[in-house]
């Protein structure tokens, strides 16, 4: 039975009450204080002090200061009046028990509200951090796009300048081609004037020679001005076999591959962006692919909780994309949420059907991640089954082979110990 303390002193004003309680040599670390609206208790073994207050107080503003073997309480009254006494008069045991239980329930409700408020503030902080990160990356993306646009404009200006130079050069060449025949004609005319000034010495056989020279001049001009006609246009029709998968037709499973492609197309159309809870999101935040890339970047920076938030939002938008569950399983593995990693890996395997070459790598990763989670839960037999399923998909993967061999050794060692 604790020893009840009756030695204390108190003073009051209309707004507050001051209570001094000696600890009687007990270490202050062993003192436990509980304060409610109508109930105050201090437990410092082997002593116990409790009082059922005359009127309600504001336990949120009230405070206690411990020091020098004394606890000094400053209790703020809800109604600014002077009390006739510290404790409530005429209180029996049943009423005391009711007041105690009521005070404990009120304290529990306040603690629950404080926990919920703290969790809500934490979620808001995470959302704000994610939004700020998205904003920074959007600014970087815009900056890169502006740089690309400036480079494109610069290249366009340089190309236009080059075209203008080419036009000027072509114009000069055309002028030169036109001037050459005129210069030849003038030279011929000067040569024709010389025999007229000396007719006696001019041989009669030079007239046809002059005619041949004129023919040569015009023939050269025609050769220079003659431009070949453009070639006639033509078109060649080419059609390819519509094969989406790279495997040979004799080795592929056409029906399964078509079913897989059909499921992928349906998954892309299965969006839930019209829900009221998504009305405050930006357009890019409603894109599961954009959220997946965002989660991948957060995973690369080891911010696994934020990555899970991004994958969660993407899954709420579209629940039929297996890679979202696969990536979230990797985050849960990093955070040791092993049961959730198993659930996400199983959901990814459920969506990765039918098994075709296009989803082989994803199925192998899902088996490995689920097997890893089983092994960390010490369920080695189940883990080995997943690793063997992964090896059936990719038999040449040496990492998976080595891990499967280690699991076999662990299982064999456990079996030998049980026999011993």
From Swiss-Prot:
Entry keyword Repeat: yes
The Gene Ontology CC terms held by the record are:
centrosome; cytoplasm; dynein axonemal particle; extracellular region; neuron projection; non-motile cilium; nucleus
Q: Where in the cell is it found?
A: Nucleus; Cytoplasm; Cell projection, Neuron projection; Dynein axonemal particle
Annotated segments matching region Disordered: 165-212
Query: What range(s) does the CS domain occupy?
Result: 3-87
GO terms for MF: nuclear estrogen receptor binding
Q: Where are the TPR repeats?
A: 288-321, 323-355, 364-397
Basic and acidic residues bias: start-end ranges: 165-192
- Keyword line: Cell projection, Cytoplasm, Neurogenesis, Nucleus, Repeat, TPR repeat
Q: Name one GO biological process term.
A: cilium movement
Instruction: Show the segment(s) annotated as Mediates interaction with ESR1 and STUB1.
Output: 7-103
Location (main, coarse):
nucleus
Assembly description: Interacts with ZMYND10. Interacts with STUB1. Interacts with ESR1 and ESR2. Interacts with DNAAF2. Interacts with CCT3, CCT4, CCT5 and CCT8. Interacts with DNAAF6/PIH1D3.
What's this protein's function? Involved in neuronal migration during development of the cerebral neocortex. May regulate the stability and proteasomal degradation of the estrogen receptors that play an important role in neuronal differentiation, survival and plasticity. Axonemal dynein assembly factor required for ciliary motility.
Q: Cross-referenced PANTHER family, in alphabetical order?
A: DYNEIN ASSEMBLY FACTOR 4, AXONEMAL, DYNEIN AXONEMAL ASSEMBLY FACTOR 4
Instruction: From the Swiss-Prot or TrEMBL record, give the protein name.
Output: Dynein axonemal assembly factor 4
What is the scientific name of the source organism? Rattus norvegicus
